[in-house]
A protein has these predicted regions:
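Helix-loop-helix hairpin linking two adjacent transmembrane segments in secondary transporters
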Residues: 146-194
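Cytoplasmic helix-loop-helix junction between adjacent transmembrane helices
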Residues: 111-151
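Conserved MFS/SLC helix-loop-helix module at the cytosolic interface between two early adjacent transmembrane helices
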Residues: 67-103
Length: 429
């Protein structure tokens, strides 16, 4: 795309688009994670085991979220991404509100599946739009800002879910967080503009050219060794993160006799503020050090994960609630370093017409490893530990969890080693 023919996108439009997408992603995580603060009252009301609650909070959502993300990303590489995001937002918000009507495990599972189907259309489209708005040197920072929707959404979900459930019951919590997303979808449709594809890189996708299939994109990515290690490391990091986020509220309720309001407030702060700082710091440090040595785009994550391991172990061994929260803030912060740079490097590894599908392939790996298996595995381990540790079964289940980050750190180290060569092979396809 020549400078003369390329339309000018103002900084105001870039910032507005990024800002709206952050708000959308915030609602994405409010609705995704609201169940984690409601596990205990739903378990008692509907008579569901820890393993069953793990399936509801993770697997029921994540299987459909992960698998449908790729075909919907294929749509995003062909269709208006703004419209797909707005429609997806309306679907998942409506299904969140309907979760409040569930009377048994299966009805709640259907509602969670609906949330997963709706949310599958969000991030691949958003990543593709932001990659078209921001050049490579700013992309990790932009995607880190977008990823702030994760800790902000979790924080507000914890705050609102705990307080509303204590005051009005768990069903009302679903209604209150679901309905505003329907209104936000109208804002997306009416005010967000679709950017030209390849704009930030001075490229123009050939719209007459046949789009690559999901299989072709996946085959392209797996020939890049940096992607294989990056996706594996990201999946393992997500495995730790989703298991922790899902079960930490229940741990503090059971181990420290906190109310839902108290657990929601304190964990909202810990998951929100250190988590947000970790996302921003990870993106900024990756851009800063990666500009000097490409390997450090991902080696920054390696260092962060190694430091997180002892902090996580200590957090679940202490007997004082405030010290546990303080120690937990460090692995929460460091465990979020991967967010911006992981997705930014995948956007850099993918040609223009593959970007939305490439993001979806990565999301599939992250969510299949992390969200499909993470929450139910913690619950299953907790159920298995009951005979040995009784009331501390969940404590020791979560204690073991953090050590998986050692495995994740190895893959980020290897990914950084291969990254420069793989980026150099990317053509303007």
């Amino acid at each position: 795309m020549s400078e003369a023919s390329r339309p000018l996108i103002s900084e105001h439009v870039k910032r507005y688009t990024l800002g709206v997408l952050v708000v959308v992603y915030t609602f994405n995580f409010i609705d995704r994670q609201i169940l984690s603060i409601l596990i205990e009252p739903i378990k008692l009301d509907l008579g569901i085991s820890d393993f069953g609650m793990g399936l509801l909070s993770g697997t029921a959502f994540a299987i459909f979220y992960a698998t449908l993300g790729m075909p919907l990303a294929l749509v995003a590489d062909r269709w208006n991404r703004r419209n797909l995001i707005g429609l997806s937002l309306a679907v998942w918000s409506g299904m969140t509100a309907l979760s409040g009507f569930a009377m048994n495990f299966w009805q709640l599972a259907v509602a969670r599946i609906g949330v997963g189907i709706g949310e599958a259309g969000c991030s691949p489209s958003a990543h593709s739009m932001l990659a078209d708005l921001y050049p490579a040197k700013e992309r990790a920072t932009a995607l880190s800002i977008y990823a702030l929707g994760i800790p902000i959404g979790i924080m507000f979900g914890m705050f609102a879910g705990g307080a509303i459930a204590d005051a009005f019951g768990w069903r009302m919590a679903f209604f209150v967080v679901g309905v505003p997303g329907l209104l936000l979808s109208v804002v997306v449709f009416l005010t967000v503009k679709e950017p030209p594809r390849g704009y930030a890189d001075g490229l123009q996708a050939d719209l007459s050219e046949k789009n690559p299939t999901i299989l072709e994109v996946a085959r392209y990515l797996v020939t890049r060794r940096s992607f294989v290690h990056l996706a594996t490391g990201g999946g393992l990091t997500a495995f730790v993160g989703y298991g922790l986020i899902t079960w930490a509220p229940t741990f503090f309720v059971r181990s420290y006799d906190m109310s839902l309001t108290e657990a929601g407030f304190w964990l909202g702060l810990v998951l929100g503020i250190p988590g947000g700082l970790g996302i921003v710091a990870g993106g900024w440090l990756s851009d800063r050090f990666g500009a000097k040595d490409t390997r450090w785009y991902l080696w920054v994550v390696t260092v962060a994960l190694l430091v997180a391991v002892p902090c996580s172990a200590a957090a679940f061994l202490v007997d004082v609630w405030w010290l546990s929260l303080l120690l937990l803030s460090f692995p929460i912060m460091l465990g979020n370093f991967y967010q911006g740079t992981t997705f930014a490097q995948v956007q850099g590894l993918a040609p223009v017409r593959m970007r939305a599908v490439a993001a979806a392939v990565l999301l599939f790996v992250l969510n299949f490893i992390g969200f499909v298996f993470g929450p139910p595995a913690v619950g299953l381990l907790s159920d298995a530990f009951v005979g040995t540790f009784n009331g501390d079964a969940l404590r020791y289940s979560l204690f073991a969890w953090g050590f998986v980050n050692l495995w994740a750190a190895f893959h980020y180290w290897r990914a950084g080693y291969y990254l420069a060569g793989d980026l150099a092979r990317v053509g303007s396809k």
